[in-house]
């Protein structure tokens, strides 16, 4: 499988997806036809989200079609060489994808050679479940099971920092709560600016920041760029 799972879409001082464009270009391998799944968008319309994505990827020669615009979404997925899933609200993304019957077709198409690109919520959707999203559950997705393309759970935008005086839980504490009730899971705390690239059966960590791996009953383990999962 070919996956590019990004923690986030924007870095300080850079344009939207700018840091990801070299990674995307390197993994295209001649692919040009893409479908974009914009359902995580809440405060922007799906048309706006699709148009923005198409504009950014056009210089790479990628032709982007919004899945919500086509008459036959399943046929569009089958024909697509690239499947792109944008960030936003993970619960809405999963709900819309499930209700439209897209989960199994997307997973199948990626397993048969389509490149999957997802950032933030799109990275969450590639995991076995969305249980490590940071998002508010604004809708009920009728279950948390997702695409299961990547075998570990990703927590995007990972940071353990708290504002001064803040008394809420740290991100690690939230993850530890999950591991109490689901000790079989492994969670990757993927900070902004980092990514996981899967190609030729190898999953490799990239990015400038330390990534953390959490398992039940174990201390967190720090990983740096180049680590192979």
UniProtKB/Swiss-Prot annotation:
Primary localisation category: cytoplasm
Keywords: Cytoplasm, Dipeptidase, Hydrolase, Protease, Serine protease
Active-site residues, as the UniProt record annotates them: 120 (charge relay system), 135 (charge relay system), 157 (charge relay system)
Catalytic activity: Dipeptidase E catalyzes the hydrolysis of dipeptides Asp-|-Xaa. It does not act on peptides with N-terminal Glu, Asn or Gln, nor does it cleave isoaspartyl peptides
Taxonomic superkingdom: Bacteria
Signal peptide segment: none
InterPro entries reported for this sequence: Class_I_gatase-like, Peptidase_S51, Peptidase_S51_dipeptidase-E
Enzyme Commission number, as recorded: 3.4.13.21
GO cellular component terms attached to this protein's record: cytoplasm
Localisation: Cytoplasm
A GO term, aspect molecular function: dipeptidase activity
Family recorded in the similarity comment: Belongs to the peptidase S51 family.
Function, as annotated: Hydrolyzes dipeptides containing N-terminal aspartate residues. May play a role in allowing the cell to use peptide aspartate to spare carbon otherwise required for the synthesis of the aspartate family of amino acids.
Entries under PANTHER family matching the protein: ALPHA-ASPARTYL DIPEPTIDASE (PTHR20842:SF0), PROTEASE S51 ALPHA-ASPARTYL DIPEPTIDASE (PTHR20842)
Name used for this protein in its record: Peptidase E
Species for this entry: Salmonella paratyphi B (strain ATCC BAA-1250 / SPB7)
Name of the encoding gene: pepE
């Amino acid at each position: 499988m070919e996956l590019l799972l990004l923690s986030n879409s924007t870095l300080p001082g850079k344009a939207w997806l700018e840091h990801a464009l070299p990674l995307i270009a390197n993994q295209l391998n001649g692919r040009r036809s893409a479908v974009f799944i914009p359902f995580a968008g809440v405060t922007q319309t799906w048309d706006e989200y699709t148009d923005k994505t198409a504009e950014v990827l056009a210089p790479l020669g990628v032709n982007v079609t919004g899945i919500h615009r086509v008459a036959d979404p399943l046929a569009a997925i089958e024909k697509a060489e690239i499947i792109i899933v944008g960030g936003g609200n993970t619960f809405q993304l999963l709900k819309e994808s499930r209700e439209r019957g897209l989960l199994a077709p997307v997973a199948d198409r990626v397993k048969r050679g389509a490149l999957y690109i997802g950032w933030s919520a799109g990275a969450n959707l590639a995991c076995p479940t969305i249980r490590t999203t940071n998002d508010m559950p604004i809708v009920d997705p009728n279950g948390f099971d997702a695409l299961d393309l990547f075998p570990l759970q990703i927590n995007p935008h990972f940071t353990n920092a708290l504002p001064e005086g803040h008394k809420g839980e740290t991100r690690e504490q939230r993850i530890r709560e999950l591991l109490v009730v689901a000790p079989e899971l492994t969670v990757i705390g993927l900070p902004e600016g980092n990514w996981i690239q899967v190609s030729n059966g190898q999953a490799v960590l990239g990015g400038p920041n330390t990534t953390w791996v959490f398992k039940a009953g174990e201390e967190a383990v720090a990983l740096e760029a180049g680590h192979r999962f």
